[in-house]
């Protein structure tokens, strides 16, 4: 049986740089192939070639789809062939309804008039196909990210898709939403729809894939059956070296208590009847890594936003640093107390995309380069920028490059560099490795271990339980705004954490295995 897709010897250059160098990829109808590689490895470039974003003639090589050569000059050419791509940044219009988004550019008309009855009927069938029980008239902006992702798939199905490309589809989804999405992909597979799945979450890659293709530095490293590969095998192929331990387990000692929070309660910014954090108390020691785990909506981010002074609603409670009660109502007061934070959404809250990498790094510490006068010491600032880039291993062609052009991992390193310029005693990391590749994750994990060895206290909030358990000395478990457990991490398991989160009792338990 002929392949559904064959990409033969694809080479794509930008100037003198080969982004893709003689890469071949093939898959059958109904096959799920995961495309793995670090950020900058060439995955996105290869997919843009396939989809016609980079038109025929701008690359070398040949693309055969359903037995015919594709010479696309535009993405609409490949869509008409049955190839659809769903990017991590969803391409939905939030102000339009679900129906309007699904049929945008593909409206059903009779004599120039849109047939809303027929489109509604078709939309209902598409939504049922992706297990979405919502009205076609629902405004997309009122949906959660998981539901929006499914609307994107329904939109692709409306175009008679035969090959679906998913780029980091679960980066912002909950565990339950991820499970629903993977089930739908498997169902589409049963209907003969092939899928190219791109993700840094290797547990998902293993769970969903028939075949795994690895690209490194623009070159095809290998394609293997997923059943015969472990996560360690994938990592080794991706980074070109064996990572003996993803989570560095370097010994460090904890010191005296540096932070204590007592009876913290935070209310919804709009509805004062809803408590997002409910009577939470905990402490933190110097040189300790404190993980905070829980399902989405548990109140983890709200808790640390109160600590950093950026929670938009009202809150009450007491914060003690070095045994003294402090009042923190904005981020400037938090920074003055030695607290720095890497936010959950780096694109929205962490970077200024059009500003240079260097300027993003020094943004919160410009007073270091003024010397008491209003004029910046440009030489001192540039020296500090270059040292930070080197220390954090930020991969950029220039410190003047707009940070929005860097990979997610390098953006995250730049934000960390900014935090370290503040000489923090307490560092808060909210989803520190979301959407970044395995190599960048490893470097950030090593940095966290180095910081706690210097006595810096670190709070890690993560939706990935293996990350929380791999890094933390102690784990707080939250559920629906309440602290359910305070667990010392002596070989804690994911099952123990989830059991603690879902237990009906509200008292705090301690584990000292």
UniProtKB/Swiss-Prot annotation:
One GO molecular-function entry: ATP binding
Entry function: Part of the ABC transporter complex XylFGH involved in xylose import. Responsible for energy coupling to the transport system.
Main location: membrane
Reactions catalysed: D-xylose(out) + ATP + H2O = D-xylose(in) + ADP + phosphate + H(+)
InterPro entries xrefs: AAA+_ATPase, ABC_carbohydrate_import_ATPase, ABC_transporter-like_ATP-bd, ABC_transporter-like_CS, ABC_transptr_XylG, P-loop_NTPase
Quaternary structure (record): The complex is composed of two ATP-binding proteins (XylG), two transmembrane proteins (XylH) and a solute-binding protein (XylF).
Residues of the signal peptide: none
E.C. designation(s): 7.5.2.10
Family: Belongs to the ABC transporter superfamily. Xylose importer (TC 3.A.1.2.4) family.
Major enzyme class: translocase
Domain ABC transporter: from-to ranges: 5-242, 259-505
Gene: xylG
One GO CC annotation: plasma membrane
Topology of the protein relative to the lipid bilayer: Peripheral membrane protein
Locations listed in the record: Cell inner membrane
Protein name: Xylose import ATP-binding protein XylG
TM spans (from-to): none
Binding of ATP, residues: 37-44
Keyword terms, alphabetized: ATP-binding, Cell inner membrane, Cell membrane, Membrane, Nucleotide-binding, Repeat, Sugar transport, Translocase, Transport
Organism: Escherichia coli (strain UTI89 / UPEC)
